[in-house]
Amino acid sequence: FDGRCDAVVLTTSDEMPGDSLDEYRALRARLLGPETPVDKGEFDFVVVGGGISGICAALAAARLGCKVALVQDRYVLGGNNSSEVRVGLGGQINVDPYPSLGYLLNEIGPDRIGNARGAHHYQDDKKLKVVLAEKNITLFLGYTVTEVEKMGDTIRSVVAVEATEQNRIKLSGKLFSDCTGDAYLAAMAGAECRMGREARAEFGESLAPVEADGFTMGVSIEWYCEDWNTPCTFPDSLDWGLRLDEYTVEPVHRANWYWEVGMRDDQVADAEKIRDYGMYVAYSTFSYCKNRYSKKEDWTCTHLVWVSHVSGKRESRRVVGDYILREQDLTRPIRHEDETCTTTWRIDQHYPMEKNSQQYPGAEWLSEGVLTPIDFYALPYRCFYSKDVRNMFMAGRNISVTHIALGSTRVMRTCGMIGEVVGMAASVCMKRNALPRDIYTTYFADLQELMRKGTGRTDVPYTQFYHQVDRTGHQAEDR
């Protein structure tokens, strides 16, 4: 199922090309000639990543007068909230101290909640329409940033490659924002990043482990099936599938957030392996229910409608800023002079489900959440720019937080407001001929003025009502 390859080479010789990226690029250059990236010009603000945070960063900056490039490696916008992944939006918007933040997210957010629903549920067209309406945004869909050109500790340009035709483009900019989730831009630019759990002693976090490790929250491969009027068959997984029985199978029609894999793997280096295992579990489960389950007659007319081919990620690299948000900031709470948008989600840590760990040690696929209450907390601006790369912001789940604090800040409505703040900060930088750190040291009052106003429209229907519990299932909506 879902077999794939990166490239097809047709040849009359017995010579086999290598599998590495460098060998592939050398072969392509030899066959097609060297390719110089097409120069797409200079932008005020280059946003890499077209998920919720990237969209909001681009929109906010564009509405405040910046010339913006928005680069997205998929052909749809929305990231985890797109029809490719289908995760609902979590968290609250429009809360103090800057209640105007979030109206921008309301413009692009779907008007329905829930995970793993039909494609229309996630309203990809709504997001795209709002972005295309902004004359200051140039959108590059299907482009992956693969190279970074720096001058000292400043990014000058990026090179991006289009997925299907392998066309290469060059985007120069004064300011950049890493909204990739996995912090790809930051890593290529040499910014310090973290991944995994910090030791308890490093920040004094009571929820942290005694020793640091590489454990992360995992990814969810969403899927669902439906009961139709027509019977159908599905290949029996007895010879190829996951070992399942009446005790270990999870006979559900829809995978929700707790179908989670890859917690013990490297979320960047092992991304393909993690995704494949999640799909393997999905197909194996459906096959077992169709062919060997004791109640398989109930599944006679059940059709597997959709399996995500893109991982719904929660955590990977986090970029280190001038401040690293920690558990105590959220639970005491500790206020900072550079407070911005507010995180409202509880500290939501995921771990392998104990029973599932016993059944599949080291290869778990079910998780459980451990929730720690917080007070609503305004995030410090210093968490939104790199301490190393002078002209790079970040927005989304890759901001400057510990593993524990990420449990609260990672949900998408919060990430959207972070993006809005970053877009505002970029506009202040352009107005003042400043860099991201200068906003904190010198021009924070300018940012405050913008945050009081917001950049979202208030004359459109308000659809982003908060639900801590998903009314369509027995588990929380977006975890």
Task: Give, region by region, the residue ranges found by the protein language model.
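Conserved N-terminal/central alpha/beta ligand/cofactor-binding core
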Residues: 60, 66-67, 72-154, 194, ...
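Conserved beta-strand elements of the Class I
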Residues: 44-46, 69, 393
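Extracytoplasmic
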Residues: 1-37
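N-terminal Rossmann-fold NAD(P) dinucleotide-binding loop
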Residues: 54
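Beta1/beta-strand and adjacent pyrophosphate-binding region of the FAD-binding site
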Residues: 39-51
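Flavin (FAD/FMN)-binding glycine-rich loop and adjacent Rossmann-like elements that form
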Residues: 32, 36, 80, 104, ...
